[in-house]
Amino acid sequence: SSVYDVLEEKFIENGDYEKLPGNQQTLRNYIHYLEDSGQINREPEHRRIYDYVFDTPPGEQMLIDFGEETLSKTSHIHFICLLLRYSRFLCVYAQDHKYNSEEACKAIYHSFCRLGGRPKELVIDQDAVFVASETYGEVIKTRVFEDFCTEQDIRLWVCNKADPESKGPIENSVGFVKKNFFSARKVTCIDDVWRSLPGWLERKNQRIHRSTLRVPRAVYDSVEKSAMRPLLPSVYETSPNTF
């Protein structure tokens, strides 16, 4: 699907979308033919584990995790994935350096603005961007993140280091971005990502999710959107909304 997505992107850019030959299944059949005939190598299949369908009420949880894509020895793309657990609607933001607490809070708030509401709870791991320390199960948030959670009146669930049931969907999303977005594109700088990422996200949120077998955008619009809490003002409200 990553290869077909790039083809879609190119045909859309050129204004020739109607001339795009075949569909995803056509391309998939052709790739299988090339693999079976030995013209290209078949990649080993990595089955995804720990992803559950509608395991929380709509509007309840947003899962957050970070990813990194290496372009060269000195160049890296850092991205943050924000996933609504119920609908599997995905938001992704990227930049050319590691996220700090303020930048992460800005990305979270921008995802709220894009969705038109905020969930009741954020699910994170013990990343230093969010968590300053943990002692005997007591989590001490970074000052910036503590202020943001208070400002947005939002609960926090910090996953244990080995908690695949809770982290599975968002870890799968990080892997999906790396495999489906980055692997099929020649990315040389952050501008390449900013140029292609919004359109890619729009298309992916309107396709059937492999775990839920439903379309994230449709589930969000028809069910989850009405369960989201209203937006609140934020100190990040006027921050530049870049990818």
Stretch-by-stretch model annotation:
Residues I124, T135, L156-K178, V193:
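RNase H-like two-metal-ion nuclease catalytic core shared by retroviral integrases
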